[in-house]
Amino acid sequence: MTISVEKPIFEEVSAFEKSGDNIGELKLDGGFSMPKMDTNDDEAFLAPEMNAFGRQFRDYDVESERQKGVEEFYRLQHINQTVDFVKKMRAEYGKLDKMVMSIWECCELLNEVVDESDPDLDEPQIQHLLQSAEAIRKDYPNEDWLHLTALIHDLGKVITLPQFGGLPQWAVVGDTFPVGCAFDESNVHHKYFVENPDFHNETYNTKNGIYSEGCGLNNVMMSWGHDDYMYLVAKENGSTLPSAGQFIIRYHSFYPLHTAGEYTHLMNEEDKENLKWLHVFNKYDLYSKSKVHVDVEKVKPYYMSLIKKYFPENLRW
């Protein structure tokens, strides 16, 4: 079955930034435009200036005990995410032989996961999923595929649990980046890539590396983690989510692309169209993190109906 997505109405803007007058206004990189929301401006989701710890979002330089752990996480990630490692993980987890369960069962399982790479929140993951989904649902009530995408975008983090192989957090969470080409300096804590074997490999350390310009992100190997795993689960289990939804799942942690604007030379035209939706999604993914809990039982029936619409009852994981 093919699902068509109504293209958003676009307004011309020139940069991805917060407006000084309205912190909820989202502006997009490279002249991309913002889809008009279905709610009035006064009712729309406002991006807060501070995270749950009272600090700026994605501030990796402020000194704190949590930040020390985040930096150590990125040191390990940057050293160990190599082409060979990614190939090994893709082969292992591509078997989808870890478990059979429903999407909602996986949501509940995610309660056991706390993301050590996240400087903004230390809450159970299901709350972040519901916070993102409910914020999008309010502003874009007619885009049900986007609501569901928000709900499931982080489900791949279950691969850090013992029943899924118990991967270390550096192989599950954090910002993602291409392997097989040069590590762009926009990557958080870039200095640690010097200890990555691929950094010194002449086949991999040029701008294009093993890829060609405009080859399309689908042909690019990303650092292994929950993004690629959940994309694989959705694709191989026959999800009918539209291309934009699957793109969001696969690249929502690719901050060097969707926030810094790097690696665009690897994109094709379809990637560029889908990136517009990812820019929309990122506002809610990043800024909806808070200590205010969503009533799970109250919203569960709605999301169960979306799961039934876009996914089989049980999936191979």
Curated annotation (Swiss-Prot):
Recorded catalytic activity of this chain's protein: myo-inositol + O2 = D-glucuronate + H2O + H(+)
Positions bound to Fe cation 2: D154, H226, H252
Disulfide bonds: none
UniProt main location, coarse: cytoplasm
Pathways involved: Polyol metabolism; myo-inositol degradation into D-glucuronate; D-glucuronate from myo-inositol: step 1/1
Cofactor note: Binds 2 iron ions per subunit.
Gene Ontology MF terms: inositol oxygenase activity; iron ion binding
GO CC terms of this entry: cytoplasm
GO BP term, pick one: L-ascorbic acid biosynthetic process
UniProt EC number: 1.13.99.1
Free-text tissue specificity from the UniProt record: Expressed in flowers, leaves, siliques, and to a lesser extent in roots.
Subcellular location per the Swiss-Prot or TrEMBL entry: Cytoplasm
Binding site for substrate: R58, D115, E116, S117, K157, G174, D175, H252, S253
Keyword Chaperone: no
Binding positions (Fe cation 1): H128, H153, D154, D285
Source species, domain of life: Eukaryota
InterPro entries registered for this protein in UniProt: Inositol_oxygenase
Pfam families noted in UniProt: MIOX
This protein's UniProt keywords: Ascorbate biosynthesis, Cytoplasm, Iron, Metal-binding, Oxidoreductase
Cofactor: Fe cation
PANTHER family assigned: INOSITOL OXYGENASE 4, MYOINOSITOL OXYGENASE
Family the UniProt entry places it in: Belongs to the myo-inositol oxygenase family.
Function: Catalyzes the oxygenative cleavage of myo-inositol to D-glucuronate. Involved in the biosynthesis of UDP-glucuronic acid (UDP-GlcA), providing nucleotide sugars for cell-wall polymers. May be also involved in plant ascorbate biosynthesis.
Protein name: Inositol oxygenase 4
Gene: MIOX4
